[in-house]
Regions:
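Positively charged n-region of N-terminal signal peptides that target proteins for export
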Residues: 1-4
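Acidic/aromatic-lined carbohydrate-recognition and catalytic surfaces
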Residues: 20-161
Length: 161
């Protein structure tokens, strides 16, 4: 039965027309920004959203039409900001949610695109979803968000992603 399903899906996949990249993406010149080390606007030694915004003219002048910003969301920063604790708020070291909205608007006003590095594949162990999932395997809302094993030494054998 598995072979029938596999062969059927394989044959059907050949019928589906391949999607093309958007025209703008085919010719995109992407500039990645790690916010903490890019441009500090307030003198605290950490780059921030206002610092990025202040450099948009320069970024555009070197031929960039797309900016990719590494994670700016609340984090414990054990993993360079990739250990997100809150996907809904900008980490205070970088600024505020309204400053992020302003940055996106300014990027668009200058005719550029912006990619936000959203780290949806993993979170901090301080993230509310992780903490809720950790409480019990019967927590229906969060129990499937993470893979758990009964042992501290045994690692999960089959990762979903």
């Amino acid at each position: 039965m598995k072979w029938i399903i596999f062969v059927s899906l394989f044959l059907v996949s050949g019928i589906v027309k391949a999607q093309h990249l958007p025209q703008w993406l085919e010719k995109a010149v992407v500039y990645q920004i790690y916010p903490a080390s890019f441009k500090d606007s307030d003198g605290d030694g950490i780059g921030d959203l206002k610092g990025i915004e202040s450099q948009l003219d320069y970024i555009k002048s070197i031929g960039v039409n797309t900016i990719w910003i590494s994670p700016v969301f609340s984090s414990e920063f054990f993993d360079g900001g990739y250990d997100v604790t809150d996907f809904y708020s900008v980490d205070e070291r970088y600024g505020t949610n309204s400053q992020l909205v302003s940055l996106v608007q300014k990027v668009h006003e200058k005719g550029m695109k912006i990619f936000m590095d959203l780290v949806a594949g993993h979170t901090s162990d301080k993230h509310p979803w992780f903490l809720q999932s950790k409480q019990s395997d019967t927590n229906l809302q969060y129990s499937d968000y993470f893979i758990w094993t009964p042992s501290k030494t045994e690692k999960p054998k089959q990762f979903v992603s």
